[in-house]
Amino acid sequence: MKILAVDTKRGLVRVVPETTDDIWLLSTVIQPGDLVRAKTLREIHFGDRGSGRSSRIPMVLTVRVEAVEFQAFTTRLRIRGIVIEGPEKYGVVGKYHTLSIEPGRELDIVKPSGWPQVLIEKLKRGSYNVAAVVVAVDYDDYAVAVVRGQGVKILASGGLHLPGKDDPTREDKLREAVTVIAKTTADVARRENALLVVAAGPGTVKNLVAEKLRGLVQGVKILVDNVSMGGEAGVFEEVRRGIMRQALQDAAVVEAERILEEFERRLAKEPGRIAYTLEQVYRAAEMGAVEELLILDETLHHPDPEVRARVDELLRLADATRAKIHFVSVESPVGYKVKALGGVIALLRYAINFAGETGG
């Protein structure tokens, strides 16, 4: 989650959700009576309805929320309500409209009575779920930064100080510089618990850094991308590119793989500290025992309305006890395994004997 602005006087928070997890998180904080402003498409009829033409017109609307629906299958949040602000020439004010919010779509959320600090903290916690590290480097400068939902923080920067192209020591100095930059980047990635590292720059130095990084860090995706320069300017250029959003979404898949691997490890060695199937995980959530929860997106759209309601209550229970909640697509290899385990799995804070429901 990228948090762009918090205005407590106006009761406004401006955010950009970046993953399905972020979309679900928004569904838990947006409530009836809130005001939500976002870009949208509205079908406008010209001439007499039925005989005239109609077009879907892009516009920015503010709605007073009446209903919020999280659609995990489409990774969208549907926000339905009465339009209270919009272009006058289209006559949309006072009519119903549904905003469709997906990853990458900026929105303003206004709570007329003010944002409770607990909800702001909830958004901030969510914005720290996934971290990426960017190293932007060329033959002159480098910078290393951590990228989270709250923004970009430069943690290291400097010059390569290479001798001239005709200097016989240039290649050795370049190798030394690459080693230092790669080690610095690896240290940042480990310290920030990053799931991916992007090596960016205009030339070949970024490739050398990426190659060195692959030998220094494990379990971290290394991505290489082209930007026009190294240093801090290169970092911010990289962050503005859409590839970062896709990388963060890919990182969420890596996180799901990590949870499944830990689940399988505990299944063999600590079976009391896992739960699977909706019933088991729900019971664990009631006890406050869920540490991390991984749920299949299609589980939220079960054909049985009672099951859907049970899933919704499970998510709210888990959230209330500060469990980390993750979603995974049924079309992914991880999703295929989670489906075979009942559509939802959990890592537990302590062991539970589900036969007798006693802690251990």
UniProtKB/Swiss-Prot annotation:
Disulfide bonds: none
Keywords from the named record: Cytoplasm, Endonuclease, Hydrolase, Metal-binding, Nuclease
Short name of any one Pfam family annotated for the protein: eRF1_1
SUPFAM superfamilies, per database record: Dom34/Pelota N-terminal domain-like, L30e-like, Translational machinery components
Single Gene Ontology BP annotation: ribosome disassembly
Compartment(s): Cytoplasm
EC identifiers of the protein: 3.1.-.-
Names of required cofactors: a divalent metal cation
Any GO molecular function: endonuclease activity
Subunit structure: Monomer.
Record text about domains: The N-terminal domain has the RNA-binding Sm fold. It harbors the endoribonuclease activity.
NCBIfam families for the chain: pelota
Role according to the record: May function in recognizing stalled ribosomes, interact with stem-loop structures in stalled mRNA molecules, and effect endonucleolytic cleavage of the mRNA. May play a role in the release non-functional ribosomes and degradation of damaged mRNAs. Has endoribonuclease activity.
Record family assignment: Belongs to the eukaryotic release factor 1 family. Pelota subfamily.
Protein name: Protein pelota homolog
Gene: pelA
